[in-house]
Amino acid sequence: MAKKSKIAKDRKQRVLVLKYASLRSELKKKADYVGLSQIPAKASPVRLKNRDSIDGRPRGYIRKFGISRIKFRQLAHEGKLPGVKKTSW
Protein backbone atom coordinates (compact mmCIF):
# COMPACT_ATOMS: atom_id res chain seq x y z
CA MET A 1 0.00 0.00 0.00
CA ALA A 2 1.25 3.47 -0.86
CA LYS A 3 1.84 6.08 1.80
CA LYS A 4 -1.31 7.91 2.87
CA SER A 5 0.30 11.19 1.85
CA LYS A 6 0.66 9.92 -1.74
CA ILE A 7 -2.99 8.87 -1.85
CA ALA A 8 -4.09 12.24 -0.45
CA LYS A 9 -1.86 14.11 -2.90
CA ASP A 10 -3.34 12.18 -5.83
CA ARG A 11 -6.91 12.95 -4.75
CA LYS A 12 -6.08 16.62 -4.23
CA GLN A 13 -4.49 16.85 -7.68
CA ARG A 14 -7.51 15.19 -9.33
CA VAL A 15 -9.80 17.77 -7.71
CA LEU A 16 -7.52 20.54 -9.00
CA VAL A 17 -7.63 19.14 -12.55
CA LEU A 18 -11.45 19.00 -12.46
CA LYS A 19 -11.64 22.54 -11.08
CA TYR A 20 -9.68 24.03 -13.98
CA ALA A 21 -10.83 21.67 -16.77
CA SER A 22 -13.47 23.94 -18.30
CA LEU A 23 -11.28 27.04 -18.04
CA ARG A 24 -8.35 25.20 -19.65
CA SER A 25 -10.49 24.03 -22.57
CA GLU A 26 -11.83 27.56 -23.18
CA LEU A 27 -8.36 29.08 -23.11
CA LYS A 28 -7.04 26.39 -25.45
CA LYS A 29 -9.85 27.06 -27.95
CA LYS A 30 -8.99 30.78 -27.90
CA ALA A 31 -5.26 29.95 -28.14
CA ASP A 32 -4.70 32.19 -25.10
CA TYR A 33 -1.32 30.85 -24.02
CA VAL A 34 -0.72 33.74 -21.62
CA GLY A 35 -3.94 32.82 -19.82
CA LEU A 36 -2.95 29.16 -19.78
CA SER A 37 0.34 30.04 -18.16
CA GLN A 38 -1.55 31.70 -15.28
CA ILE A 39 -3.27 28.41 -14.37
CA PRO A 40 -1.36 26.16 -11.95
CA ALA A 41 0.84 23.64 -13.75
CA LYS A 42 -0.52 20.80 -11.62
CA ALA A 43 -3.98 21.48 -13.06
CA SER A 44 -2.90 19.87 -16.32
CA PRO A 45 -4.43 16.39 -16.78
CA VAL A 46 -1.19 15.21 -18.41
CA ARG A 47 0.54 15.40 -15.03
CA LEU A 48 -1.82 12.90 -13.40
CA LYS A 49 -0.36 9.51 -12.54
CA ASN A 50 -2.74 6.57 -12.69
CA ARG A 51 -3.03 5.22 -9.15
CA ASP A 52 -5.17 2.54 -7.55
CA SER A 53 -8.19 4.30 -6.03
CA ILE A 54 -8.23 1.93 -3.05
CA ASP A 55 -4.63 1.59 -1.90
CA GLY A 56 -2.71 4.03 -4.12
CA ARG A 57 -0.52 1.52 -5.94
CA PRO A 58 1.01 3.28 -8.99
CA ARG A 59 1.91 0.20 -11.05
CA GLY A 60 -0.26 -2.49 -12.61
CA TYR A 61 -3.20 -0.09 -13.01
CA ILE A 62 -6.32 -1.27 -14.86
CA ARG A 63 -8.06 1.77 -16.35
CA LYS A 64 -11.49 0.24 -16.83
CA PHE A 65 -11.83 -0.43 -13.10
CA GLY A 66 -9.53 2.24 -11.65
CA ILE A 67 -7.67 -0.26 -9.48
CA SER A 68 -4.42 -2.22 -9.58
CA ARG A 69 -4.13 -5.77 -10.85
CA ILE A 70 -3.65 -7.07 -7.31
CA LYS A 71 -6.82 -5.44 -5.94
CA PHE A 72 -8.67 -6.44 -9.11
CA ARG A 73 -7.80 -10.09 -8.56
CA GLN A 74 -8.72 -9.93 -4.89
CA LEU A 75 -12.08 -8.24 -5.49
CA ALA A 76 -12.89 -10.51 -8.44
CA HIS A 77 -12.28 -13.63 -6.35
CA GLU A 78 -14.56 -12.22 -3.64
CA GLY A 79 -17.26 -11.55 -6.25
CA LYS A 80 -17.33 -7.81 -5.53
CA LEU A 81 -16.84 -6.72 -9.15
CA PRO A 82 -20.11 -7.00 -11.09
CA GLY A 83 -19.84 -8.78 -14.42
CA VAL A 84 -16.37 -10.19 -13.74
CA LYS A 85 -15.86 -13.92 -13.55
CA LYS A 86 -12.89 -16.22 -13.76
CA THR A 87 -12.29 -17.79 -17.15
CA SER A 88 -10.48 -20.87 -18.29
CA TRP A 89 -9.34 -21.85 -21.77
Curated annotation (Swiss-Prot):
Biological processes annotated in GO: translation
Single GO MF annotation: rRNA binding
GO cellular component: cytoplasm; small ribosomal subunit
Top-level taxon of origin: Bacteria
Main function: Binds 16S rRNA, required for the assembly of 30S particles and may also be responsible for determining the conformation of the 16S rRNA at the A site.
Family: Belongs to the universal ribosomal protein uS14 family.
HAMAP family: Ribosomal_uS14_1 (MF_00537)
Assembly mode: Part of the 30S ribosomal subunit. Contacts proteins S3 and S10.
Protein name (Swiss-Prot/TrEMBL): Small ribosomal subunit protein uS14
Species name: Phytoplasma australiense
